[in-house]
């Protein structure tokens, strides 16, 4: 009896974990972006932001093209424009800024994958007083690698434990040529000037990204 109860508990826990990584398409904090045959849905997990506080999203990448695409799922950055009140969360790498290739996840043709990303709100220098410049909107930007041909061997090498793949000049050039930045619609947010108490994941060290596979072929 105890064994059966354990199995049921594990199944329920696994189901809850899977549900947590899905984008709620009915959530008012859902954003959408589409560039040709790549669609991205994202759900902002906070409606109130604060300085040094967390910002996190669940996002789904759907590849509607006939070729495989890839995303550097462990790379994220946060930028704040005080003039426009826009905070931008950028996911993936627009350029290869390091000497090692970032972790890449491939999305095959016809496939959907879901990830988590986030970081720490920073750059809000004047958050108090009548002339405070604080975020009023969040825009999510996702960088997608449209052509993975030049990175196939590198991606395969990354599957080995503790693998480190050096960036070559050809990789750098192909990345610039193949990268596509997809902007999702902006989402309104509130701002809190209350101090942050809990530690959060930084943009340079994002939390673990999870990918859920659905109907896609080999790439």
Predicted regions, residues:
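Terminal connector regions
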Residues: 121-199
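Beta-strand-rich interaction surfaces with strong enrichment in secreted/lumenal proteins
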Residues: 45-47, 101-107, 129
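Short, solvent-exposed loop/turn segments enriched in Ser/Thr/Gly
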Residues: 52-58
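The feature marks short-to-medium sequence segments in extracytoplasmic or secretory-pathway proteins
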Residues: 66-112
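Hydrophobic h-region of N-terminal signal peptides that target proteins for export
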Residues: 10-20
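Asparagine-centered strand-capping/turn motif at beta-strand->loop junctions
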Residues: 59-66
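Low-complexity, acidic Ser/Thr/Pro/Gly-rich terminal tails and inter-domain linkers that flank the onset
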Residues: 21-51
